[in-house]
């Protein structure tokens, strides 16, 4: 599928960083915090510094990222989460709620049992028995994917738990089959889209519109206040919008430059993806906002919510391993959506840059999709919470929900393109706060 500059979809997220000064052990340290983080994340990172020797020692895990297939949880995750462990009284309450839930289930009152199990896990999120019992209840309700997720979480907490192992062995093949069927559905929609002539006027219009929507949602997720029409004005005229932040407008110009580079230079190129390619993408993304840091690896430790990315001295080695994986037969053998999602996650996990990691990861993801004949995908700003939630789940050890999220976004993008090129086409939905996600799907006749 030939790709023009306009064949971009909307997606966006960035994890930016701001300097904050922290007094620790009589020394003044500079610590970088996420721009998009909430106030409690600042406090969390500060507490981590006060409670552990973050800078000392070599006893650290580094991400080797050997994930194989959608149904396999990611391993070797370097995650430092400051969780308040439940007190003995809270654990007792969770146990009591679990016992009461089992009694309600025995009496056939499944709705009450469901609520009690949720209450038990709210009290004690790592209660393995409650995770197992809620999973069994969800299995009975035919929610196999969520049940399998709960069993996987139980095994993350207690790897040798016999009940969780038995439950997971039962759901795993079913989940694999569900995932593969969904990939097949996406493939059928890609095939239908590719059957539309390249010169189709409706397709050209919607691709052009999706280009601007991509930039709009990418920067809006980060708090950028520019409207879709203002972004179009900046890109088309290169003139500033009066009364708007120049930094916000430079973010738009940087995204435009990076997308043009990927589309014109990398999509149709034959050969391996290199570290230099990734650095060039980042140099354009950040070049108009922070030219000093643009296109080079970070030299400071950073915090991303509860996640502590690898130490800066490990970044270059991890990036070499990442690029080696990108070009490996193992990665190439994956379904394109799974490959693209894993590439996104692995890069954003390493977090090699001071800023712009999310945007770089998403552009790399779309590069992989386009090279496989898929359209670049749309993730709207209204999906921001879900997007970060599944990334957090991946950091906890299960990358499958993130892959499914990317698959859902891929299908939504395909649906929009197919709807727009139907007999009675409609345009892309206008940005608004009430739009959550595109839930409509198109039945493919075989």
Swiss-Prot record:
Name the membrane topology term: Single-pass type II membrane protein
How is this chain's activity regulated?
The side chain of Glu-222 determines which of the two opposing activities (AMPylase or de-AMPylase) will take place. In response to endoplasmic reticulum stress, mediates de-AMPylase activity. Adenylyltransferase activity is inhibited by the inhibitory helix present at the N-terminus: Glu-222 binds ATP and competes with ATP-binding at Arg-362, thereby preventing adenylyltransferase activity. In unstressed cells, disengagement of Glu-222 promotes adenylyltransferase activity.
Please write the reaction equations for the catalytic activity of this protein. L-tyrosyl-[protein] + ATP = O-(5'-adenylyl)-L-tyrosyl-[protein] + diphosphate; 3-O-(5'-adenylyl)-L-threonyl-[protein] + H2O = L-threonyl-[protein] + AMP + H(+); L-threonyl-[protein] + ATP = 3-O-(5'-adenylyl)-L-threonyl-[protein] + diphosphate
Which keywords describe this protein according to UniProt?
Answer: ATP-binding, Endoplasmic reticulum, Glycoprotein, Hydrolase, Magnesium, Manganese, Membrane, Nucleotide-binding, Nucleotidyltransferase, Repeat, Signal-anchor, TPR repeat, Transferase, Transmembrane, Transmembrane helix, Unfolded protein response
GO CC, any one term: endoplasmic reticulum membrane
Q: Does the keyword Cell wall biogenesis/degradation apply?
A: no
**UniProt GO MF annotations:** AMPylase activity; ATP binding; protein adenylylhydrolase activity; protein homodimerization activity; protein-folding chaperone binding
Q: Which cofactors does the annotated protein need, by name?
A: Mg(2+); Mn(2+)
- Copy out the cofactor comment: Divalent metal cation. Prefers Mn(2+) over Mg(2+).
Q: Which residues are glycosylated?
A: 263
- The gene that this protein is the product of is ficd
Write down what this protein is called. Protein adenylyltransferase FICD
**Where, by residue number, does the polypeptide cross the bilayer?**
19-39
Chain ranges on the Lumenal side, renumbered to this chain: 40-446
One matching Pfam family, short form? Fic
Q: Where does the record place the site Important for autoinhibition of adenylyltransferase activity?
A: 222
């Amino acid at each position: 599928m030939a790709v023009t500059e306009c064949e971009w979809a909307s997606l966006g997220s960035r994890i930016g960083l701001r300097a904050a000064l922290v007094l620790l052990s009589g020394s003044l340290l500079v610590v970088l915090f996420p721009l998009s983080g909430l106030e409690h994340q600042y406090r969390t990172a500060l507490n981590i510094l006060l409670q552990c020797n973050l800078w000392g020692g070599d006893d650290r895990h580094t991400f080797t990222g050997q994930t194989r297939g959608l149904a396999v949880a990611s391993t070797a995750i370097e995650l430092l989460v400051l969780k308040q462990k439940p007190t003995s009284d809270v654990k007792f309450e969770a146990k009591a709620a679990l016992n009461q839930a089992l009694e309600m289930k025995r009496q056939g009152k499944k709705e009450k049992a469901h609520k009690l199990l949720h209450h038990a896990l709210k009290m004690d999120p790592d209660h393995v028995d409650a995770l197992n019992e809620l999973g069994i209840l969800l299995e009975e309700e035919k929610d196999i994917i969520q049940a399998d997720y709960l069993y996987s979480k139980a095994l993350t907490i207690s790897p040798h738990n016999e009940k969780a192992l038995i439950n997971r062995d039962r759901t795993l093949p079913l989940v694999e089959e569900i995932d593969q069927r969904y990939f097949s559905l996406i493939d059928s929609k890609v095939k239908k889209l590719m059957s539309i002539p390249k010169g189709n006027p409706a397709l050209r219009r919607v691709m052009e519109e999706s280009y601007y929507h991509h930039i709009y949602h990418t920067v809006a997720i980060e708090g950028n206040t520019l409207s879709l029409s203002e972004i179009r004005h900046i890109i088309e005229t290169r003139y500033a919008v009066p009364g708007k932040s120049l930094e916000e407008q430079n973010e738009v110009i940087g995204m435009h430059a990076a997308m043009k580079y990927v589309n014109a230079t990398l999509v149709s190129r034959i050969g391996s993806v290199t570290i230099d390619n990734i650095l060039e993408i980042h140099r354009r993304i950040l070049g108009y906002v922070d030219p000093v840091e643009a296109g080079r690896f970070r030299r400071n430790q950073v915090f991303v919510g509860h996640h502590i990315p690898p130490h800066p001295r490990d970044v270059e080695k991890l990036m070499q391993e990442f690029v080696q994986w990108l070009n490996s037969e193992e990665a190439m053998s994956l379904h394109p959506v799974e490959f693209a999602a894993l590439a996104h996650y692995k890069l954003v996990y390493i977090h090699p840059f001071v800023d712009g990691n999310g945007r770089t990861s998403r552009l790399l993801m779309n590069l992989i999709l386009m090279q496989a004949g898929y359209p670049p995908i749309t993730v709207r700003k209204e999906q921001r919470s879900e997007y970060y939630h599944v990334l957090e789940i991946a950091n906890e050890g299960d990358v499958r929900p993130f892959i499914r999220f990317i698959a859902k976004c891929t299908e939504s993008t395909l649906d929009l393109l197919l709807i727009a090129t139907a007999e009675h086409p409609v345009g892309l939905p206008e940005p608004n706060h009430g739009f959550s996600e595109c839930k409509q799907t198109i039945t493919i006749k075989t």
